[in-house]
Every structure is written in C-alpha cells, then in structure tokens.
Amino acid sequence: MDNLEYRSGVGIMLLNKDNLVFAACRNDMKEEAWQMPQGGLEAKETPEVGVLRELEEETGIPPRMVAIISHTKEWLTYDFPADLQASFFKNKYRGQRQLWFLARYLGRDEDININTDKPEFRAWKWVEPKQLPDLIVAFKKPLYEKILSEFSASL
C-alpha cells in the first residue's frame, strides 16, 4: 500500500492556563484511544481555518476561545495500521499528512462540550505534555514525539 497517498489534515495541541494539554478518548474504537483533536481539511480550506473548524466540531470550543501560538515547521506524516487503512478509509489513504498547531485555550472547562452533533469522543481530560506519547495509540507515538519536540520551547 506504499503507493497510496496521505490524507491532508490538521491537528491542535491545546494548552490550558496550567500548560496542560487537552486529550480526548475516541468513541469509535474498542480499546481506549486517546488523542489531541485532529481532522481532515476540506476542499480549498486553509490549515488555520480547518484546525479551528475541527476543534469546534469535536469539542464545541469556538474560535474566539482559542489563541494560536504557532504551528509545526513542516507537515508531519504517519501511516495507518493495515486494519484501520481498510476499515476507516477503504484503502484510499496510506496515512495522514498533518500540519499541527499549538494554541492557548481561553475558555473554561465548562465551555468544552464533546457531546456534539456527531460525537467523536467519549471522554476528555487535561494531561501533562510528557504523558501524551504513552497515552495515545502506538502507531501515533512517533508523531506525538515529533509534535512535542517541535513545541517544547513553548510548553
């Protein structure tokens, strides 16, 4: 499946006032699968617009409650395991190619609502940045280590 392309998307490392990172548990997997908010870009959508749209769709957090700090220097990639490649994306994509953003959350915990129109998460929490690689699914661990490395000066 090396000839398949990467799906273009965005992700966000959202920090609260205590420099803890927002992490949420997916509701479409049997095992616990925690991650930061992420998603695909729509046609002709800029990464900045896309990441704020995805964040609001997944968490109910509107753009006015977020201050973008920076983004990764390059687009980062990861490959899907074969079973996910087949089940989630019908073997259309090899994995994802994402631009990641670092942002400050300006709202309150009560403003977060994962029970959206199309809920993607069943739980959420604030975690220490260094906990992320051990919290998420194994195939995303190298990606999360790159994200942490790139944003380390701001954490």
From Swiss-Prot:
Function as written in the Swiss-Prot or TrEMBL entry: Accelerates the degradation of transcripts by removing pyrophosphate from the 5'-end of triphosphorylated RNA, leading to a more labile monophosphorylated state that can stimulate subsequent ribonuclease cleavage.
InterPro entries assigned: Nudix_hydrolase, NUDIX_hydrolase-like_dom_sf, NUDIX_hydrolase_CS, NUDIX_hydrolase_dom, RppH
Recorded name of the encoding gene: rppH
Provenance organism: Zymomonas mobilis subsp. mobilis (strain ATCC 31821 / ZM4 / CP4)
Key words of the record: Hydrolase
HAMAP family to which the protein is assigned, alphabetical: Nudix_RppH (MF_00298)
This protein's name: RNA pyrophosphohydrolase
Top enzyme category: hydrolase
Names of the cofactor(s): a divalent metal cation
Record-stated family: Belongs to the Nudix hydrolase family. RppH subfamily.
EC number of this enzyme: 3.6.1.-
One GO process term, biological-process aspect: ribose phosphate metabolic process
Record motif Nudix box, residues: 39-60
